[in-house]
Protein backbone atom coordinates (compact mmCIF):
# COMPACT_ATOMS: atom_id res chain seq x y z
CA UNK A 1 0.00 0.00 0.00
CA UNK A 2 1.31 3.43 -0.86
CA UNK A 3 1.04 6.43 1.37
CA UNK A 4 -1.47 8.04 -1.00
CA UNK A 5 -3.76 5.06 -0.73
CA UNK A 6 -3.55 5.27 3.07
CA UNK A 7 -4.46 8.96 3.29
CA UNK A 8 -1.02 10.63 3.30
CA UNK A 9 0.72 12.38 0.42
CA UNK A 10 3.34 10.24 -1.27
CA UNK A 11 5.82 10.46 -4.10
CA UNK A 12 6.41 8.00 -6.89
CA UNK A 13 9.56 7.38 -8.87
CA UNK A 14 8.13 7.13 -12.40
CA UNK A 15 9.68 5.42 -15.40
CA UNK A 16 8.81 3.87 -18.72
CA UNK A 17 8.64 0.24 -19.70
CA UNK A 18 8.06 0.34 -23.42
CA UNK A 19 5.87 3.38 -24.08
CA UNK A 20 3.88 3.05 -20.86
CA UNK A 21 4.57 5.00 -17.68
CA UNK A 22 4.84 3.21 -14.35
CA UNK A 23 5.67 4.33 -10.84
CA UNK A 24 6.72 2.88 -7.51
CA UNK A 25 6.71 4.43 -4.08
CA UNK A 26 9.92 6.42 -3.79
CA UNK A 27 10.38 5.12 -0.24
CA UNK A 28 11.28 1.74 -1.74
CA UNK A 29 13.97 3.16 -4.09
CA UNK A 30 17.59 3.16 -2.95
CA UNK A 31 19.19 4.65 -6.07
CA UNK A 32 19.10 4.79 -9.86
CA UNK A 33 22.04 3.68 -11.99
CA UNK A 34 22.84 3.86 -15.69
CA UNK A 35 22.22 0.63 -17.54
CA UNK A 36 25.10 -1.59 -16.43
CA UNK A 37 26.57 -4.68 -18.03
CA UNK A 38 24.31 -7.54 -16.98
CA UNK A 39 25.74 -11.04 -16.52
CA UNK A 40 23.09 -13.66 -17.39
CA UNK A 41 21.86 -15.87 -14.54
CA UNK A 42 21.28 -19.19 -16.30
CA UNK A 43 18.52 -21.31 -14.81
CA UNK A 44 16.90 -18.41 -12.97
CA UNK A 45 13.28 -17.32 -13.39
CA UNK A 46 12.72 -15.79 -16.84
CA UNK A 47 12.04 -12.37 -15.28
CA UNK A 48 15.57 -12.35 -13.83
CA UNK A 49 17.63 -10.51 -16.43
CA UNK A 50 20.86 -11.38 -14.65
CA UNK A 51 23.35 -10.00 -12.15
CA UNK A 52 25.39 -6.81 -11.99
CA UNK A 53 28.36 -5.75 -9.91
CA UNK A 54 27.55 -2.48 -8.17
CA UNK A 55 30.43 -1.11 -6.12
CA UNK A 56 31.60 -4.61 -5.22
CA UNK A 57 28.14 -5.96 -4.38
CA UNK A 58 25.93 -8.24 -6.44
CA UNK A 59 22.53 -6.93 -7.56
CA UNK A 60 19.87 -9.20 -9.06
CA UNK A 61 18.28 -7.48 -12.07
CA UNK A 62 14.58 -8.09 -12.70
CA UNK A 63 12.95 -7.20 -16.00
CA UNK A 64 9.47 -5.75 -15.43
CA UNK A 65 8.84 -5.96 -19.20
CA UNK A 66 8.83 -9.75 -18.92
CA UNK A 67 6.62 -9.70 -15.83
CA UNK A 68 4.16 -7.33 -17.51
CA UNK A 69 3.91 -9.43 -20.67
CA UNK A 70 6.00 -7.29 -23.04
CA UNK A 71 8.56 -10.05 -23.45
CA UNK A 72 12.31 -9.62 -23.51
CA UNK A 73 13.76 -6.51 -25.07
CA UNK A 74 17.15 -5.05 -25.86
CA UNK A 75 18.68 -2.71 -23.31
CA UNK A 76 19.44 0.71 -24.78
CA UNK A 77 21.45 3.81 -23.94
CA UNK A 78 18.58 5.21 -21.85
CA UNK A 79 18.10 1.99 -19.88
CA UNK A 80 18.33 2.55 -16.15
CA UNK A 81 18.48 0.29 -13.14
CA UNK A 82 16.16 1.23 -10.27
CA UNK A 83 17.79 -0.31 -7.19
CA UNK A 84 15.28 -1.18 -4.47
CA UNK A 85 16.01 -0.92 -0.78
CA UNK A 86 16.51 -4.09 1.22
CA UNK A 87 14.18 -4.82 4.13
CA UNK A 88 16.80 -3.46 6.53
CA UNK A 89 16.94 -0.16 4.61
CA UNK A 90 13.19 0.37 4.36
CA UNK A 91 11.50 2.80 6.69
CA UNK A 92 8.85 1.08 8.75
CA UNK A 93 6.21 3.67 7.91
CA UNK A 94 3.13 2.55 6.01
CA UNK A 95 4.00 -1.11 6.64
CA UNK A 96 6.30 -1.23 3.61
CA UNK A 97 8.24 -4.49 3.34
CA UNK A 98 9.94 -6.22 0.44
CA UNK A 99 11.06 -9.82 0.33
CA UNK A 100 14.69 -9.02 -0.47
CA UNK A 101 16.36 -10.28 2.67
CA UNK A 102 19.87 -8.88 2.46
CA UNK A 103 19.99 -9.21 -1.34
CA UNK A 104 19.91 -6.10 -3.48
CA UNK A 105 17.45 -6.12 -6.36
CA UNK A 106 17.16 -3.75 -9.30
CA UNK A 107 14.49 -3.20 -11.94
CA UNK A 108 15.72 -2.54 -15.45
CA UNK A 109 13.52 0.15 -17.03
CA UNK A 110 13.63 1.76 -20.45
CA UNK A 111 13.98 5.31 -19.15
CA UNK A 112 13.32 7.39 -16.04
CA UNK A 113 10.50 9.95 -16.15
CA UNK A 114 10.35 11.97 -12.92
CA UNK A 115 9.22 12.05 -9.32
CA UNK A 116 5.46 12.48 -9.15
CA UNK A 117 3.69 13.72 -6.00
CA UNK A 118 0.39 12.02 -5.24
CA UNK A 119 -2.30 13.62 -3.13
CA UNK A 120 -4.28 11.46 -0.69
CA UNK A 121 -6.86 9.52 -2.69
CA UNK A 122 -5.00 10.28 -5.94
CA UNK A 123 -4.47 6.63 -6.79
CA UNK A 124 -7.50 4.93 -8.28
CA UNK A 125 -7.98 1.18 -7.85
CA UNK A 126 -7.69 -0.94 -10.95
CA UNK A 127 -10.99 -1.69 -12.67
CA UNK A 128 -12.15 -5.22 -11.87
CA UNK A 129 -11.65 -6.54 -15.41
CA UNK A 130 -7.96 -5.53 -15.53
CA UNK A 131 -6.87 -6.96 -12.21
CA UNK A 132 -5.27 -9.96 -13.88
CA UNK A 133 -1.81 -8.39 -13.69
CA UNK A 134 -0.80 -10.82 -10.93
CA UNK A 135 -0.97 -8.00 -8.43
CA UNK A 136 1.96 -6.19 -10.07
CA UNK A 137 -0.19 -3.10 -10.64
CA UNK A 138 -1.91 -1.81 -7.52
CA UNK A 139 -3.66 1.22 -9.03
CA UNK A 140 -3.53 4.03 -11.58
CA UNK A 141 -3.10 7.78 -11.51
CA UNK A 142 -4.98 9.70 -14.16
CA UNK A 143 -3.07 12.61 -15.66
CA UNK A 144 -4.34 14.91 -18.37
CA UNK A 145 -2.43 13.20 -21.18
CA UNK A 146 -1.53 9.76 -19.79
CA UNK A 147 -1.90 7.33 -16.91
CA UNK A 148 0.71 6.20 -14.44
CA UNK A 149 0.36 2.55 -13.49
CA UNK A 150 1.39 2.15 -9.85
CA UNK A 151 3.50 -0.97 -9.35
CA UNK A 152 3.70 -3.02 -6.20
CA UNK A 153 7.42 -3.81 -5.84
CA UNK A 154 6.70 -6.54 -3.28
CA UNK A 155 4.54 -8.33 -5.88
CA UNK A 156 7.32 -8.01 -8.45
CA UNK A 157 9.69 -9.84 -6.13
CA UNK A 158 7.34 -12.81 -5.77
CA UNK A 159 8.62 -14.72 -8.77
CA UNK A 160 6.47 -17.76 -9.31
CA UNK A 161 7.13 -20.65 -11.62
CA UNK A 162 5.04 -20.71 -14.77
CA UNK A 163 4.80 -16.93 -15.09
Locate each region found by the language model.
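An acidic, low-aromatic, low-complexity terminal/linker signal
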Residues: 1-163
Amino acid sequence: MTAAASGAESRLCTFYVGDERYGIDILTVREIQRGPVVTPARGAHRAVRGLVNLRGGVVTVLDPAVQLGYGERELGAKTRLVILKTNAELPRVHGTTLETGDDRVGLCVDRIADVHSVEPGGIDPLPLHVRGSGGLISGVIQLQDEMIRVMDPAAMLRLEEGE
